[in-house]
UniProtKB/Swiss-Prot annotation:
Belongs to the UPF0304 family. It holds the Pfam family YfbU. This is UPF0304 protein VV2347. InterPro entries: UPF0304_YfbU, YfbU_alpha-helical_sf, YfbU_helix-hairpin_sf.
Amino acid sequence: MEMSNAQRLILSNQYKLMSQLDPENAEKYQRFQTIVERGYELQMRELNKDYGCITEALCKEIIDVMEMYHAMQESFRMLDADESTQVDQRRLQFLGFDIASEAQLVHYVRFLTESEGLYPQFDKGDHHFNSQMPMLEKYRRMLATWRKCPRQYHLCATELRQIFNA
């Protein structure tokens, strides 16, 4: 994150104010203030990770992933008893993304489900959409398989298994 001296001064002052307004987190804000004032670029990346940007294309892709899970869940509900026994129900749960390596994606999913009220049927579980392992590439393979299905919202057990195994 490159900043001019003026931007660093403004941000430093913001952190100083935050440390005074939020005494419980004062130590954290003072640390951020020191990082910004002294221009420690390695640590400034840490500050940037919370303020990064997700492209419009990636936002749409995340929504597509969530829509795919919605379609799989609805398809499962329409299966007859014989077919439903061929599908591992646990794999129908949308796990989210890895907070360690895909934090912005986790935050976006939380924004969509909490602030925007989308996909209320998704169980956020104990981990609140933190899959605890990188998932984006897996979801991309699943999306590619799902998009090849002729009836994306009326999938059979075989198609569901193919998507899971992508």
